[in-house]
Amino acid sequence: MAETRTRRRSFIRQHSLSITSAAVLALWIYLYSRSNPSTHIGSFFGNAIADWTGLLVMVLATKYLFERGSAESRRPPKNFMGSALQRLRDHSLTIFLLVTGLGWVFLYASLDSESKWGQVVGNIVSEWTQILGLVLMTKILIERHSKESNR
């Protein structure tokens, strides 16, 4: 029993950032679904959904995916793979952001941009663009005194 509890705590402890981020995102979604988007608070909840979706994707995507040359991405493990698979792995973060970003764009195009959820999805498209831009820019550009630029 104690071993199971320790293992459970360990899992929660090891994934607490992604779990908490997902919980906060779920809270914003719940609050927005109950609010009037024409009010300040309703508009805030809608914007918070896009922001926290972006935060959650940064936490999870940079945990599991890679982007060769980007200071924002962790280094891929050194093991032998076929060159095509290695290229896919080395750029999996950009590929993931492009594919899911296109999904958000298609969803946004199918919605009324002025509707309650259309505004949120539009903000998510903007967030995805920012994340992809950050990943791509950090492959080339540097920022003085940034620990990521020292790599």
Kindly label every feature range from the protein language model:
Residues 1-11, 23-30, 119, 139-151:
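Sequence termini and other peripheral, non-core segments
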Residues 2-9, 73-88:
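Membrane-interfacial, low-structure loops and terminal tails that flank and connect transmembrane helices
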Residues 7-19, 87-92:
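N-terminal membrane topogenic signal
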Residues 11, 44-45, 66, 80, ...:
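Phenylalanine-focused residue identity feature
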Residues 12-18, 24, 28, 43-49, ...:
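N-terminal first transmembrane alpha-helix
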Residues 16-20, 52-56, 92-96, 128:
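Alpha-helical transmembrane segments
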Residues 20-30, 95-107:
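Hydrophobic core of alpha-helical transmembrane segments in multi-pass integral membrane proteins
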Residues 32-64, 71, 106-143, 147:
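A structural feature that tracks compact, well-ordered secondary-structure segments
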